[in-house]
Amino acid sequence: MIDKQVIVIGAGLAGCEAAWQIANSGIAVKLVEMRPLNSTPAHHTSEFAELVCSNSFGALSADRAAGLLQEELRTFNSLIIQTADKFSVPAGGALAVDRSKFSKSLTQTLSAHPFVEISRFEQLDLPNKKNITVLATGPLTSDELATKIKKFTGIDSCHFFDAASPIIYGDSINHEIVFKASRYDKGDPAYLNCPINKLDYFNFRNALINGEQASLKDFDKESANFFEACLPIEEIARRGIETMRYGPLKSIGLWNPNWGDLFDRENRLKKRPHAIVQLRKEDLEGKLLNMVGFQTNLKWSEQKRIFRMIPGLEKAEFVRFGVMHRNTFLESPKLLLPTLQFLKRETLFAAGQITGTEGYAAAAAGGLLAGINASLLAKNKNLVTFPNESMIGSLMNFISNRNEIMSNQKKNKFQPMPASFGLVPELTNKIKDKKLRYKAYQERSLKELQVFKKVLDASFKNDQLLVEIN
């Protein structure tokens, strides 16, 4: 007999979303979170869904992959995206949040939900198979539970090294050098920009690649396995003299009006900086600023010394230094069904970054699907998968046994995947223009999801609760 209370292990983005979906379907949830009793190298608080890396969910526009994923989540009343929208901060064309208010609100909302029981302890083993369970422990799953998961699956977990960027006090920067602008003047001037000339750039790069690294278990800078979309800044610097200028330090599309006429070619070539470091608001007031793209494993003393070489940051005061940590994830295509159930146990679901999705919205998407299906299983109803044409559906296909290449061939190495239009099926009528093609993907997805949502709503008819977000 199945226990009707669903257990969700981990109150990160995926776990919070799963718990919300389950509780709002009228099913009792026990949400288990080990913090603050047992924290991780990357966490600083005991709040739910603490954003340990960037405070950005990616592009807002629905004709971008990340933006489409956000819009799909809004369609299904995602707690994560609704809360992100509520506590958003200016970030040009991206959805960025005040991470403190975001996490506190999620904690309060779920703690106040009548169908959610919060349990603060470290889960040391997988619950009994009679318990419907959502495993949403994230990339920083505790060692003991990770060992039990390995024993259950019979497969070693994969890993990569991830890092967080430093945060500095906004009133410690030099505003005579730093200027406000968004790339290509899109939206409000949401970023602060630190221009760097050629000589300063080369001196800065030299300091970066020779900076002393923090010691980290199993980490060797010569052989470490990184996630390519979130490389440490010193690793980017090591890959080539100009590599940073084509990544987080690119200056294209950024211009300070004090430099004169942008459209005067001679002036533009003379005044354009060799590189630019961008700072993004962590809160509405701009009291805290994130160094965009500056994930790092440098020692804290080295971060202070080297990052103060950046023009405008000579007297920067650091709220938080960057840190690196080891991220663990499952070889999901060999373990999961498209419903996010484990092949070996129908009552056990997995969701979030532990499944090999990358990005905050993708983690929420996994929690959304796992939560919906855990609810359906508890109600003895048929489980669902999202349409292949949707970003949610295509991501879940990639991390499940529908990904035939990854699930059947030992030679291919499974790596985390963010939202990408490369995952969705081709259009019936091919469109060469990229912008028009992406727009067509968006329209097709949202149209398919409206049909899917009607079917799903019928499954939950008379069951759903209307609970407001704090």
From Swiss-Prot:
Record Gene3D superfamilies: FAD/NAD(P)-binding domain
Keywords attached to this entry: Cytoplasm, FAD, Flavoprotein, Methyltransferase, NAD, NADP, Transferase, tRNA processing
Enzyme Commission numbers on file: 2.1.1.74
Catalytic EC class: transferase
Record carries keyword Flavoprotein: yes
Amino-acid positions noted as binding FAD in the UniProt annotation, renumbered to this chain: 10-15
Keyword flag Metal-binding: no
One GO CC term, this protein: cytosol
Main location: cytoplasm
Subcellular location: Cytoplasm
Superkingdom in the source lineage: Bacteria
Molecular function GO labels: flavin adenine dinucleotide binding; tRNA (uracil(54)-C5)-methyltransferase activity, 5,10-methylenetetrahydrofolate-dependent
Pfam families: GIDA (PF01134)
Reported cofactor(s): FAD
Annotated GO biological process: tRNA methylation; tRNA wobble uridine modification
Purpose of the protein: Catalyzes the folate-dependent formation of 5-methyl-uridine at position 54 (M-5-U54) in all tRNAs.
Family of this protein: Belongs to the MnmG family. TrmFO subfamily.
Name by which UniProt lists this protein: Methylenetetrahydrofolate--tRNA-(uracil-5-)-methyltransferase TrmFO
